[in-house]
């Protein structure tokens, strides 16, 4: 089989490192990045690409339109990219909006959102947890060892955080809704209690990490927290903390979104590349 031709567009540094990781699978063109190196072929203009791609890899999309953010504040539109794709091309990206999905699907392209893939979510837990640990070390005046840490939820990210903070010597507890999750946490050496009991427990924690994408910490709970408690919200927008109330109460809150790309862009890029490879293998491309 001939080597695949990839067109990687826009994004931050992890998109560049993803491009580098895809090199072993074929020839890789990069457009809209201010980074260069390795065997990745940089394109100053999209029209400089004189062959059509088998795979278009878009970054994590933030808007609701057809534009893709590039370095230097520039943008490229999906309508500019479709002419550079083979008819059988795969189009993949992160958090693809409905307009992009409909646009490429209408042209007959196979479309896949790598951000919805289970393997990417599992692998991203580690850099997310390490990012939370880094924030806790930078934003508090205490050691992680001996600190009292509360984690809300006990899904993949919460488990990774609990393992990491516990390994650093923190006294970790988790707030959960299901008794099965509480039992699992207790089996792993963690204190566990129900969300309904949060109000009574919250004053004793130095660091509180939220992983639940629903409102948890309202004004009442924020007010009950100790003065110097650090809140780290890892949940996707809109998060689980009343940020306006937190500001009014002078609470320390860090909304930590997209941590893998910020704290470990090389690893994050490799994870995306591995996920793209999985998609290609599954779809026989």
Regions flagged by a language model, labelled:
Residues 42-49, 191-197:
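Short acidic-hydrophobic, aromatic-tinged amphipathic segments that line or gate anion-handling sites
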Residues 58-145, 275, 282:
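Glycine/serine-rich phosphate-binding loop and adjoining beta1-alpha1 elements at the start
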Residues 6-16, 22, 145-165:
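Glycine-rich adenosine-cofactor-binding loop
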Residues 61-64, 77-86, 187-261:
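Rossmann-like adenosine-cofactor binding region
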Residues 2-5, 88, 145-148, 228:
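Phosphate-coordination loops involved in phosphoryl transfer and adenosine-cofactor binding
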Residues 95-114, 234-281:
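Rossmann-fold NAD(P)-binding glycine/threonine-rich loop
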Residues 25-39, 168-188:
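NAD(P)-binding Rossmann-fold cofactor-contacting core
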Residues 12, 34-35, 97, 177-179, ...:
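Residues in the short beta-alpha loop(s) of Rossmann-like NAD(P)-binding domains
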């Amino acid at each position: 089989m001939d080597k695949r031709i990839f067109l990687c567009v826009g994004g931050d540094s992890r998109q560049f490192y993803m491009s580098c990781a895809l090199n072993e699978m074929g020839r890789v063109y990069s457009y809209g990045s201010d980074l260069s190196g390795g065997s990745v072929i940089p394109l100053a203009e999209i029209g400089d690409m004189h062959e059509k791609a088998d795979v278009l890899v878009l970054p994590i999309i933030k808007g609701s339109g057809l534009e893709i953010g590039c370095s230097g504040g520039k943008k490229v539109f999906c309508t500019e990219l479709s002419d550079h794709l083979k008819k059988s091309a795969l189009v993949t990206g992160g958090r693809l909006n409905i307009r992009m999905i409909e646009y490429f699907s209408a042209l007959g392209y196979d479309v896949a959102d790598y951000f919805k893939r289970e393997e990417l979510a599992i692998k991203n837990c580690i850099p997310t947890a390490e990012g939370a640990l880094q924030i806790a070390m930078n934003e508090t005046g205490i050691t992680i060892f001996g600190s009292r840490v509360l984690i809300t939820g006990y899904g993949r990210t919460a488990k990774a955080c609990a393992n990491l903070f516990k390994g650093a010597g923190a006294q970790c507890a988790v707030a959960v809704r299901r008794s099965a999750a509480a039992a699992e946490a207790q089996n792993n050496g963690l204190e566990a209690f129900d969300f309904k009991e949060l109000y009574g427990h919250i004053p004793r924690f130095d660091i509180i990490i939220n992983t639940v994408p629903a409102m948890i910490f309202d004004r009442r709970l924020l007010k009950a927290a100790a003065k110097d408690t650090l809140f780290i919200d890892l949940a996707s927008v809109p998060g689980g903390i009343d940020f306006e109330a937190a500001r009014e109460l002078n609470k320390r809150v860090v909304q930590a979104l997209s941590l893998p790309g910020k704290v470990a862009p090389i690893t994050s890029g490799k994870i995306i590349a591995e996920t793209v490879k999985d998609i290609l293998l599954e779809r026989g491309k």
